[in-house]
Amino acid sequence: MRTERAELPFSWYFLAAAAVSLITSAIHVVAGTPEIMAPLLASTLPPVVKGVFDVMWHQITALLLLGSGASLVAAARPAWRLPVAVLIGGQFALISVLFITLGAMWFSSPWPMPQWVLFGAMTVLLLIGYRRGAA
């Protein structure tokens, strides 16, 4: 027997995920750019390598802002919650796994690259938000 899910009109979990994503994008741009991109762009790497890194850097900014916007819409629109939880949450989960795995490979610890904590938090908030969307 199938039961219908009664969706809550507003999700504070999706709103929280949107806020964390927005804050993460600000940290990425304000703190990360001078720490990571400035030395990389000042290096003697070939221009094409610098260009690709620059695109990748700004791509992450765009993905974080998109995740924030989609999560914000999903907070108010129940029909958006499953797609956002799966697509944005799945993307953030994979990024967390990358940080943990590559941190372990490069540094024998995930802590030199703690970004996985924020991406993991966003993933958890989106999944809880979807699961608790039923009244």
Features from the language model and the residues they span:
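Membrane-interface interhelical connector segments
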Residues: 36-46
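Core segments of alpha-helical transmembrane spans in multipass integral membrane proteins
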Residues: 19, 23, 27-35, 48-76, ...
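Hydrophobic alpha-helical membrane segments
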Residues: 60-63, 84-99, 118-125
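Membrane-helix boundary connector in multi-pass membrane proteins
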Residues: 78-79, 90, 96-114, 127-135
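Non-cytosolic membrane-interface motifs at loop->transmembrane helix junctions
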Residues: 44-50, 106-119
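Cytosolic juxtamembrane helix and N-cap/initiation of the first transmembrane helix
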Residues: 1-24
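Juxtamembrane helix-break-helix junctions at the cytosolic face
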Residues: 3-10, 68-86, 130-133
